[in-house]
C-alpha cells in the first residue's frame, strides 16, 4: 500500500446523507475479486442513464469536477451492506480522501485498509470546503491532521493506529510480514502433528 502523507487534489461534492454501499457500487458489479476496474461503475445508477450515457446533472460528471481526488459528502457515508468493493470503486476512480459528516464503521475501516483517508468533519466546515473553487487544490496533511485551502485551515483527528498505518503504507499483510522472523521461530518450536 502506498504511504499517505500529504495529498493535494481537487474536490467533488456529493452532499447526500446515507449514501449506502449499493449506491456506491451496485451489486451486479461485485462478481470480481480484483481490486481494480471498479471505478467505471462508481455511483453507476446516478452517473449514467439507461443507455449508459453520462447524466449531465450528476455532480461527478461536471467538467470542472472530473479528476477530483477528494470527495466531500454527507452524513453516514458507506452505510448498508458490508462490501469492500465500495472502497475499491472509490479508490479506482481516483479518490484518496473522503470527507463526510460520519461513516459506517466497517466502511470507514475498509477505506483505510485500502489506502484512502476518511475524515469526519462537521457540516459547517464541510460547507466551507464545498465553496472552494472546483479548480483549487486542497491540501490534506495527515501527519499534522490539517486540511488547507487558499482561505481556510481545518483540523481533523484520526485514531493513532490508523494514522500510523496510512503514514507508513501498512496493510494487514505488511504488518504481519514485519513479524516474519518471529513467526518462523514459533513454527520451528511447535511440534508437527
UniProtKB/Swiss-Prot annotation:
GO BP of this protein: L-leucine biosynthetic process
Pathway given in the UniProt record: Amino-acid biosynthesis; L-leucine biosynthesis; L-leucine from 3-methyl-2-oxobutanoate: step 2/4
Top-rank taxon, per record: Bacteria
Coiled coil: none
GO MF annotation: an example: 3-isopropylmalate dehydratase activity
EC number(s) stated in the UniProt entry for this protein: 4.2.1.33
Keywords: Amino-acid biosynthesis, Branched-chain amino acid biosynthesis, Leucine biosynthesis, Lyase
GO cellular component: 3-isopropylmalate dehydratase complex
Cleaved signal peptide residues: none
Matching InterPro entries: 3-IsopropMal_deHydase_ssu, Aconitase/3IPM_dehydase_swvl, AconitaseA/IPMdHydase_ssu_swvl, IPMI_Swivel, LeuD
Catalytic reaction annotation: (2R,3S)-3-isopropylmalate = (2S)-2-isopropylmalate
Family matches, as SUPFAM superfamilies: LeuD/IlvD-like
Pfam families: Aconitase_C
NCBIfam families documented for this protein: leuD, PRK01641.1
Subunit structure: Heterodimer of LeuC and LeuD.
Function: Catalyzes the isomerization between 2-isopropylmalate and 3-isopropylmalate, via the formation of 2-isopropylmaleate.
Family classification: Belongs to the LeuD family. LeuD type 1 subfamily.
Protein name: 3-isopropylmalate dehydratase small subunit
Organism ancestry: Bacteria, Bacillati, Bacillota, Bacilli, Bacillales
